[in-house]
Amino acid sequence: MEAVRPDSCESGPAAPRAEERPAPEARVHFRVTRFIMEAGVKLGMQSIPIATACTIYHKFFCEINLDAYDLYLVAMSSIYLAGKVEEQHLRTRDIINVSHRYFNPGSEPLELDSRFWELRDSIVQCELLMLRVLRFQVSFQHPHKYLLHYLISLKNWLNRYSWQRTPISVTAWALLRDSYHGGLCLRFQAQHLAVAVLYLALQVYGVEVPAEGEAEKPWWQVFSDDLTKPIIDNIVSDLIQIYTMDTEIP
């Protein structure tokens, strides 16, 4: 199977800026990762397992043509596999029922008939395929622990009034969660993503870091020495594209 290397799969400091308008593939992946996130929440998954499921999904389609397999089957298998990787094990029956209700709101759970067992077997077989395609490399370093550390540090820098009157922390976490709609988790380092969402959250509310003008280097470089402004700009640009798709896709 010929591998595909879309922009969202490129990694490293020199990752290219996103195009002005999201590619059709990006819109498809947006829909499917939105399903992963919503299904994950209904299944009671924590933020890290959901992030892992999205990353597995994105990484798989960096190796496989978009039309080679059913996207939502891959998504369900990504959820199932992520639960194992992050030790939040999920039953295939629950994944199937949540997915069924996602596409058929108000419907009853599927009967344990041949259709159910065929779907269950498909999820398990797809999981094995994904493990082989990804060469069993399904553990990832996520930005969450870095963002938590950076938020604690920033809270100590800012005055109490600035911190309490603006939802910087809530916004940064929301930006990080939404970044998994795209391939940012593959294109950029975890530390860089964590700093960039914090940078954007501060920009949104017009909050300035104290003594920024007198410091030898910007606050964001204190958190990550190899981070540059162009990398931050690239991440912010990709995030803006994600929110643009969110307004355009029903």
Swiss-Prot record:
Keywords recorded for this protein, A-Z: Acetylation, Cyclin
Domain of life: Eukaryota
GO annotations of cellular component type: cyclin-dependent protein kinase holoenzyme complex
Renumbered residue ranges of the record's region Disordered: 1-23
SMART domains listed in its UniProt record: CYCLIN
A GO biological-process term: positive regulation of MAPK cascade
InterPro entries linked to this entry: Cyclin-like_dom (IPR013763), Cyclin-like_sf (IPR036915), Cyclin-Q_first_cyclin_box (IPR048055), Cyclin-Q_second_cyclin_box (IPR048053), Cyclin/Ssn8 (IPR043198), Cyclin_N (IPR006671)
Complexes and interactors: Associates with CDK10 to promote its kinase activity.
Role this protein plays: Activating cyclin for the cyclin-associated kinase CDK10.
Entry's family note: Belongs to the cyclin family. Cyclin-like FAM58 subfamily.
Protein name, UniProt field: Cyclin-Q
